[in-house]
């Protein structure tokens, strides 16, 4: 993860801290897929076109929307995720083709090549926690190394919801 961040930082100009985090998140969501419902996005599907509605960012965004729809999340949550990722994914500068390839396609390919195997063999809470911790460190305000992300397995979170008698759909319980 550190190598991926450094590689993107050094070789992909014009991407800020938030952009790198959003691109990793978007790439992971787009490549997860849902068996029998949403096919995972493959690198070859990104064509680096500058045609309106068919840029690499548009393709990734459509795949994310299909994934979120099948996950049956509340509409407000889907809208929040899309709004957060959309500005980065549809920015003209990262969708502009240079030497036949957009910056977005290059970054997407790096992310899939570096992280894809972990998701293909089965996403684990431990790996996801490490991913969140690493990406949190990419952000400029995260100087405090004592902060850490802890992911609770869903069965434990469900038990805690029942014990605490809170709304399980609260954003506090998202991860």
Question: Where do the model's predicted regions map?
Answer:
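Long recognition/docking surfaces used for binding and targeting
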Residues: 29, 33-140
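Active-site-adjacent structural elements in folded domains
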Residues: 142-146
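Amphipathic alpha-helical interaction segments
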Residues: 19-27, 110, 126, 130, ...
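Conserved S-adenosyl-L-methionine
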Residues: 147, 152-175
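Accessory nucleic-acid engagement/destabilization modules that flank
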Residues: 1-49
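Generic structural signal for alpha-helix starts
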Residues: 16, 70-74, 153
């Amino acid at each position: 993860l550190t190598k991926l961040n450094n590689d993107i930082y050094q070789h992909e100009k014009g991407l800020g801290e938030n952009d790198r985090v959003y691109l990793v998140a978007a790439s992971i969501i787009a490549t997860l897929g849902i068996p029998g419902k949403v096919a995972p996005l493959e690198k070859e599907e990104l064509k680096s076109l500058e045609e309106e509605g068919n840029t690499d960012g548009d393709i990734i965004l459509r795949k994310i929307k299909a994934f979120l729809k099948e996950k049956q999340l509340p509409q407000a949550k889907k809208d929040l995720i899309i709004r957060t990722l959309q500005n980065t994914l549809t920015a003209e500068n990262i969708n502009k083709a240079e030497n036949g390839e957009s910056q977005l396609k290059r970054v997407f390919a790096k992310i899939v090549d570096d992280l894809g195997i972990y998701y293909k063999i089965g996403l684990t809470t431990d790996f996801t926690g490490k991913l969140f911790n690493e990406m949190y460190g990419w952000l400029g305000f995260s100087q405090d190394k004592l902060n850490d992300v802890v992911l609770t397995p869903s069965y434990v979170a469900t038990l805690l919801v029942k014990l605490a008698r809170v709304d399980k759909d609260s954003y506090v319980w998202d991860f």
